[in-house]
Amino acid sequence: MKDGDFVTIDYVARVKDTGEIFDLTDEALAKKESMYREDVNYGPVTFIVGANFVIRGLDEALHSMEVGEKKSIEISPDKAFGPRHDELVKLVPESQFKQQDMKPSPGAFVNVNNIRGRIVSVSGGRVKVDFNHPLAGKTLQYELEVKGVITDRDGKLNAVLDYFTGKSGKVKVGKVSDNEVEIETGVDVQRRLKELIATTISKWIGVKTVKFVDVFRHEELRQGEQKQEDGQAAESKAGGKAVKS
């Protein structure tokens, strides 16, 4: 494989020391290991080699693989999620969580000043939060299989959309010409996400112009109406008012 290849792979990723699976594409294995989640789309995934879509050690391994090849690799922390830093374990006043109507508990993930961390302990009005990545300092093991390489432009466009939206269907490829592509978006696609999609398409597929067209489909509008109705009903039960002033 080389930089710019759209490679489709299956994988199982484990923490070396414990054998714990932290990521995988195999739905049957996820169910067997009691880690299946309904909100996850299982199956082979497509990455762009050299585009920083995956950790460095995995990207380097893909460079030396071919379609149909299977390989087990070991990735050191410096090529995975980096080393642990003691200074990223901090004490946060418990009152800061109470102000947000949160009850801190060990093991829970929280956002403090827009930084994600995991609560280690709660004691004496202070909460110890670890802001290291959960896999920082850990050596990882991957079982890889290269399923194929996408070469057609439509396939590449769909792969980019799937990567950034998790196969949610929120965005779809619309009209395509030599130098321009239209991306149909749903009702809740943020500007930052559009920028990431457009930048990736321009750099790795070579399309000069990326347009986003808002498409309001009946089922999406109905879902929005239902959420609004549910919110108004809940507010009514709580004795609140849903009046726009």
Segments predicted by a language model, with ranges:
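FKBP-type peptidyl-prolyl cis-trans isomerases
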Residues: 1-245
